[in-house]
Amino acid sequence: MSAPNPNKQPVELNRTSLYWGLLLMFVLAVLFSSYFFN
């Protein structure tokens, strides 16, 4: 895949924070859509 990265923890931390950000945006989109369609 790619070269072994010695600094693996910050990459995983950024990836998990990115996933949490996407999840938060998804929840906000669902809330706003339900608010507008109600």
From Swiss-Prot:
It is a single-pass membrane protein. It is found in: Plastid, Chloroplast thylakoid membrane. The keyword Metal-binding does not apply. The keyword NADP does not apply. It comes from the Eukaryota. The chain crosses the membrane at residues 17-37. InterPro entries: PSII_PsbL (IPR003372), PSII_PsbL_sf (IPR037266). Keywords: Chloroplast, Membrane, Photosynthesis, Photosystem II, Plastid, Reaction center, Thylakoid, Transmembrane, Transmembrane helix. GO terms for biological process: photosynthesis. GO terms for cellular component: chloroplast thylakoid membrane; photosystem II reaction center. PSII is composed of 1 copy each of membrane proteins PsbA, PsbB, PsbC, PsbD, PsbE, PsbF, PsbH, PsbI, PsbJ, PsbK, PsbL, PsbM, PsbT, PsbX, PsbY, PsbZ, Psb30/Ycf12, at least 3 peripheral proteins of the oxygen-evolving complex and a large number of cofactors. It forms dimeric complexes. Belongs to the PsbL family. One of the components of the core complex of photosystem II (PSII). PSII is a light-driven water:plastoquinone oxidoreductase that uses light energy to abstract electrons from H(2)O, generating O(2) and a proton gradient subsequently used for ATP formation. It consists of a core antenna complex that captures photons, and an electron transfer chain that converts photonic excitation into a charge separation. This subunit is found at the monomer-monomer interface and is required for correct PSII assembly and/or dimerization. This is Photosystem II reaction center protein L.
